Design a protein with these regions (language model features):
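ABC ATPase NBD Q-loop/coupling interface
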Residues: 65-81, 147
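Helix-to-loop junction immediately C-terminal to a conserved catalytic motif
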Residues: 54
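Walker A/P-loop
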Residues: 47
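Conserved structural motif at the start of ABC-family nucleotide-binding domains
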Residues: 7-9, 23-25
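The feature captures the beta-strand-to-loop junction immediately N-terminal to the Walker
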Residues: 39-41
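ABC-family P-loop ATPase nucleotide-binding domains
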Residues: 94-156
Length: 156
């Protein structure tokens, strides 16, 4: 299981690139191991906050700070943020024909390794099958293409 993370947002201000301010003084602290839900009415900034944290190019941070496990999140590239474990899960995930769930997960693990290191295929599949057995999941899910033939909940 990946290590728990802490997220600290202090007085975060952001705007749409070349546009109007959209986040004004957001403060939030999520300690390691806690799970929080960001809730609010349409237009309150939930998606914008998520996109700003992930480094979406349509938004510009104009003030404040954000740290993830003590590291300056705003100084990280989009790629570094994803490798640190920050990502968006879409409400309606797209299907990716031709890419199996197993290959997708292996590629995700590979992306987190230092350059030149490889995920050993035999070890990976052995570990994957073991984890799926622990969770009571049918291993046939690994052979399906990403999100193909899954219910909405399974996709997420």
């Amino acid at each position: 299981m990946p290590p728990a993370m802490s997220l600290v947002i202090k007085n975060l201000h952001a705007r749409v690139k070349d546009g109007a301010p959209i986040l004004n003084g957001i403060n939030l602290e999520i300690p390691k191991g806690e799970v929080h839900a960001i809730m609010g009415p349409n237009g309150s900034g939930k998606s914008t906050l998520s996109k700003v944290l992930c480094g979406h190019p349509d938004y510009e941070v104009t003030g404040g700070s954000v740290s993830l496990d003590g590291q300056d999140l705003l100084a990280m590239s989009v790629d570094e943020r994803s490798r640190a474990g920050l990502f968006l899960a879409f409400q309606y995930p797209v299907e990716v024909p031709g890419v199996t769930n197993a290959n997708f997960m292996r590629a995700a693990m590979q992306a987190r390794l230092p350059k030149g290191e490889d995920v050993d295929a035999v070890s990976f599949y052995k570990e994957l099958r073991g984890r799926m057995k622990q969770l009571g999941m049918d291993t046939k899910f690994t052979a399906r293409a990403v999100n193909e033939g899954f219910s909405g909940g399974e996709k997420k």
